[in-house]
Amino acid sequence: MPRSSSISYQILPYGPNAWLLQLDNPDDIAALHTLRKASFQHIQECVVAYDSLLLTTSSPLTQSQVKALVHDTLQKHTSPDNKQRHHVIEVHYTGPDLQDLATASKLSIQEIITLHSSAIYSVRFLGFSAGFAYLDGLPEPLQLPRRSTPRPKMEPGAVAIGGKHAGIYSTPSPGGWNWLGNTDYPLFHPDRNDHSAFTLHPGDTLEFRPIS
C-alpha cells in the first residue's frame, strides 16, 4: 500500500498499458486531480473517477515503475500552495423547493435549513457545468430524490440538493436538483483561463451559513 505524504492508495493492473490508482480514503480526492494536471513521463492519459484514477501509459511499465512515477509526481507537486481551502458560503434560504422538501422529509423548513447549514461538505469533483461542484457530506435526512421534472433554468448561485450530494449552480442551466436558496459567492470567473477560473476545487471543504 504505497503512501505519498499522508495519502494512501493502491495501484492495480487494469489491462494493457493501464493502471488503476485506488484511494484508500476518498477524501484524498485532491491527489487525483494533482496527478491529472501534472505532466509526467510515460503517462499518456489520466481519467479521474469518484475515488480512483485510471492511468494509461505510452509504453509497457511494471507496477514498480508506475508506483515510482506516482510517488515522485505527488512529492513534486504537493506543496503548501496546493493545500485544500475551506469556504464559508452565505445563503438566503428562500428557495422554491423548501416546502416540497419539508413535506417529503417530514421535517420543518427550519429543520431543513439547520441540517443543511450544520454540515461540513467536501468538494468531490466539478461536474456538468463550469464550476459546478458535487459536494459530499449531505446529512442523511436530506438525501432525497431529485425533482421528477427538471426546471428549464436554475439561477447562478442556486444552492441545491439531489440524492446524496449538495451543490451550487455556477451558471444558468437547466436543473433537477431541489432548490434551497441562493448565494452571491462567486464560483466561476469566465475571464480567467487557468485553474483560478473556478473558486471551488476537489478536496476543498465548505459550510453554508444562513443569512436573512
Give names to the regions the model predicted.
Residues P2-S212:
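Glycine-rich active-site loops that engage anionic ligands at enzyme catalytic sites
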